[in-house]
């Protein structure tokens, strides 16, 4: 067997490093804390709807965490499902 026709070995490909996990915090507040009603109210509209990402400025992952937290607080009775209808 001759070594002239031997194919060169491929170098081992490195797997790209994973992105760091997003910490669901807003300053000193944890977005997963469903008992912190004052912080969660900042992300609700006047009628009680969850504000969209473009208004809150959160990442997609943080917005999903926030939505789960608000829904959990609503089920436990800490936040209302709806507010009074605001008429202008």
Swiss-Prot record:
Keywords: Ribonucleoprotein, Ribosomal protein, RNA-binding, rRNA-binding. One of its GO terms (cellular component) is ribosome. Residues 1-22 are annotated as: Disordered. PROSITE patterns: RIBOSOMAL_S18. Transmembrane segments: none annotated. Gene3D superfamilies: Ribosomal protein S18 (4.10.640.10). GO terms for molecular function: small ribosomal subunit rRNA binding; structural constituent of ribosome. Pfam families: Ribosomal_S18. One of its GO terms (biological process) is translation. Located on the back of the platform of the 30S subunit where it stabilizes the close packing of several RNA helices of the 16S rRNA. Forms part of the Shine-Dalgarno cleft in the 70S ribosome, where it probably interacts with the Shine-Dalgarno helix. HAMAP family: Ribosomal_bS18 (MF_00270). Part of the 30S ribosomal subunit. Forms a tight heterodimer with protein bS6, also interacts with protein uS11. Binds to the C-terminus of IF3 and to the central section of Era. PANTHER family: 30S RIBOSOMAL PROTEIN S18, SMALL RIBOSOMAL SUBUNIT PROTEIN BS18M. Belongs to the bacterial ribosomal protein bS18 family. NCBIfam families: S18. This is Small ribosomal subunit protein bS18.
